[in-house]
């Protein structure tokens, strides 16, 4: 059928109706062809796998999540928090992975701890696998009042030991806080199932000696953190 456009007013309602019908059909087809959540996850996995490659010391196996990260990622994506019961199970599982100091000494040199907290080097494809990693702690926390450049994703750690009443880190009274601090740095998910804090010791970001120095930075009464 050939339409005549001699009269604009006579054909306008017809054209509007046709346009509306086309929009409805497009909407219906769009809804019918939209992938479900599982399909979207599969598509995303495919995109991720084809978008990254091994380079230098960095391997694509870093993209493989363990159960803790996977469950928390799903909870974040769906907006449905992990149940309190499941969160407790995740925390207990991660607590079992905490490696306590082999020599029984929890505190190291706070000066070395400050260097580690300041450094964000390590674990990138331009880094040497033999170099010591930094903790990059200032990226998320205020730690000393001298450093004015810090992130706020995590809570301020300034006066960390002082406000917790730790005057002698080697005392029996300070033991619970000292052990908690070590465990939190080693594997943060042992105390908060879906913590955003990197599991520094568990993930091999920091070694035992480095964790000891960072604990010293936070708890040594002589550290600028507690002044």
Q: What are the language-model segments listed below?
A:
Residues 123-126, 146-150, 224-225:
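Secretory-pathway/luminal and periplasmic proteins that interact with or process carbohydrate-rich
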Residues 2-20:
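Bacterial N-terminal signal peptides that target proteins for export
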Residues 43, 48-51, 108-112, 138-209, ...:
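Extracytoplasmic electron-transfer domains, predominantly the class I c-type cytochrome c fold
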Residues 125-136:
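Local sequence-structure signature of Cys/Sec-based thiol-disulfide redox active-site neighborhoods
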Residues 101-102, 126, 200-203:
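Generic anion/oxyanion-binding catalytic loop in active/binding sites
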Residues 24-28, 145-148:
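Residue-level signal for alpha-helical transmembrane segments in multi-pass membrane proteins
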Residues 2-5, 25-123, 184, 217-227:
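Post-cleavage N-terminal segment of exported redox proteins
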